[in-house]
UniProtKB/Swiss-Prot annotation:
One of its GO terms (biological process) is L-histidine biosynthetic process. It comes from the Bacteria. This is ATP phosphoribosyltransferase. It catalyses: 1-(5-phospho-beta-D-ribosyl)-ATP + diphosphate = 5-phospho-alpha-D-ribose 1-diphosphate + ATP. One of its GO terms (molecular function) is ATP binding. The gene is hisG. The keyword Transcription does not apply. NCBIfam families: hisG. Feedback inhibited by histidine. GO terms for cellular component: cytoplasm.
């Protein structure tokens, strides 16, 4: 029996809820046969898949080791904890939740410090005056070093933070911070501001693949099935299905609809009886319906699409190109 395909998802909180909802929308229902406290799960219909419930940081570490095939975790953790991340893991797709920015934040009282260039001047002057480097509180050590090096900021030292990083300047353990934020409200409440060019990374939850995992033929086929579900759901979300029938429809009219409303005709032009099926961006539905009625359609129906399966699967093609041949 072949080894299981391991999908790692967050083990608690909103990230777990959002991850499970994302897969459910794609027709992949995650469940825990052992109960809510079980840290192993399954996907209905995919018997060889084992779902591992881990913390977001553990997921990144397991992706680096190759002990999981797919994992759901933030890009910030991937970039911070995996050396040469682009060679070892693949960010297959952003999942549309878990948004947050990794930022450089300084005290609001530093009214003349707005950019990284300003920060360079201040850190240099601080060292000359106090004979020590400015302290940066953060848990993003590698991201901070890389970003500061890009901006030629060298007169600083990192103070590793295990939590409540935004409070470090107020209690005197650091002069500034690098931290993750969604709205900036917590930073502002602690008297901090984000530098104008201080957004280091715009992160969100991603579906990530490990190059180091055991990519047997069975594992690749399982990945193809999972990504086919996800791609079909994503494709369906871009369109509504529009159906009508009228004798006045011809190639010229269809070409005009394509160019004006961004529609696609997945099954070709109208049938001999004039039946036409189009996929239309939601924002163009009313305009398309008016256009079709102006040209002879009596009735135009609109329906939501659950899935649109296509011969090509761009997500799996992306994965296949990344994995060892």
């Amino acid at each position: 029996m072949s080894a299981p395909f391991v999908l790692a998802v967050p083990s608690k909180g909103r990230l777990q809820e959002n991850a499970e909802a994302f897969f459910a929308r794609a027709g992949l229902t995650l469940s825990k046969p052992g109960g809510a406290r079980d840290y192993r799960g399954t996907i209905a219909g995919l018997d060889n898949v084992e779902v591992a419930y881990l913390s977001a940081s553990e997921i990144a570490a397991n992706l680096a080791r190759g002990s999981v095939h797919f994992g759901v975790t933030g890009e910030d953790l991937v970039r911070e904890s995996i050396t040469d991340a682009d060679k070892r893991v693949l960010l297959i797709d952003g999942l549309g939740f878990g948004y947050a920015n990794v930022v450089v934040a300084v005290p609001q009282a530093w009214i003349d410090v707005r950019t990284m260039a300003d920060l360079d001047d201040v850190t240099t002057g601080f060292r000359a005056q106090h004979n020590r480097r400015m302290r940066v509180a953060t848990k993003y050590i590698n991201l901070t070093r890389g970003f500061f090096a890009q901006h030629n900021v060298v007169d600083y030292r990192i103070v590793e933070s295990a939590g409540a990083t935004e409070g470090a300047p107020a209690v005197g353990t650091a002069e500034m911070i690098v931290d993750i934020t969604t709205t900036g409200a917590t930073l502002a409440a602690n008297g901090l501001k984000v530098l104008d060019d201080g957004v280091m990374l715009r992160s969100q939850a991603n579906l990530v693949a490990s190059r180091e995992a055991d990519w047997s033929d069975t594992a690749r086929e399982t990945a193809r099935v999972i990504l086919d579900h996800i791609a079909s759901r994503a494709r369906a979300g871009k369109y509504k299905e529009v159906r009508t029938r009228f004798k006045g429809c011809n190639d010229a009219l269809l070409a005009e609809a394509h160019s004006r409303f961004g529609v696609v005709s997945p099954f070709g032009g109208p049938t001999s009886s004039g039946m036409l099926t189009l996929h239309c961006p939601p924002a163009q539905i009313y305009a398309l319906g008016s256009f079709l009625r102006q040209h002879g359609a009596d009735t135009v129906s609109v329906a939501a699409l659950d899935y649109v399966f296509d011969k090509e699967n761009p997500l799996f093609s992306k994965l296949a190109a990344f994995l060892p041949q």
